[in-house]
Regions:
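Short, hydrophobic-biased segments on the C-terminal half of alpha helices
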Residues: 180, 184-188
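C-terminal scaffold of the Radical SAM
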Residues: 1-176
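A short, conserved structural fragment
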Residues: 187-197
């Protein structure tokens, strides 16, 4: 449990929600016999754990990471150099691209994603021939690349500074807003509920 994790005094902790995908992993069907927590129960577990971590001196990084105040992720967040890839939060200094090595591994490149085969014999055969063993790939359009940057910035900083982001990406604010279909009027309900300001 979280109290035991805190006692071991790690520098970082990450809390991900359990992914129940029995159509991929048939063994997970066994868990359904015991019952799985609903969304409200999962949120309560997360909130309880986050509260205990905060009381123990950890600070939240983004949506699911908790670190000591002197951790490089904390420093990156304070200096707006925090980044996130599909594996979690990291510093921009350490995150240009992610290269997936091995069966089912996923690569995240500047303008594309690729996944290696799930078939071990096929993977060994193609790699032995000096070939890549990619079975799925997706090339991001320029608009999708902009959208990804806006989403990552929001996930890392909790806000969007359109002017700062436009300077960093060398595009206009109107281009960024168009890429994300940004419409301030559509956000008014969230503001009314206190979710954004």
């Amino acid at each position: 449990n979280i109290e035991q994790a805190i006692l071991s005094s790690p520098d970082r902790l990450v809390m991900f929600s359990y992914a129940h995908v029995p159509w991929i992993n048939k063994r997970q069907l066994l868990l359904e016999k015991s019952g799985l927590p609903d969304n409200h129960e999962k949120q309560t577990m997360f909130d309880t754990a986050a509260g205990l971590l905060h009381k123990s001196g950890y600070q939240s990084i983004g949506m699911d990471h908790f670190v000591r105040p002197n951790d490089e992720l904390s420093i990156a967040m304070q200096t707006k150099k925090l980044h996130r890839n599909f594996q979690g939060y990291c510093t921009r200094r350490t995150t240009a691209q992610v290269y997936g090595l091995g069966v089912t591994a996923i690569s995240q490149l500047e303008s594309a994603y690729a996944q290696n085969t799930k078939d071990i014999p096929h993977y060994i055969k193609t790699i032995s021939k000096g070939e890549l063993s990619i079975t799925k790939g997706y090339a991001l359009s320029p608009t999708e690349q902009l959208t990804r940057e806006v989403i990552v910035t929001l996930m890392c900083n909790g806000c969007i500074d359109w002017r700062d982001l436009s300077k960093r990406l060398h595009v206009s604010v109107s281009t960024l807003k168009a890429a994300t279909a940004y419409d301030e009027k559509k956000l008014s309900g969230f503001a009314d509920d206190g979710l954004i300001y």
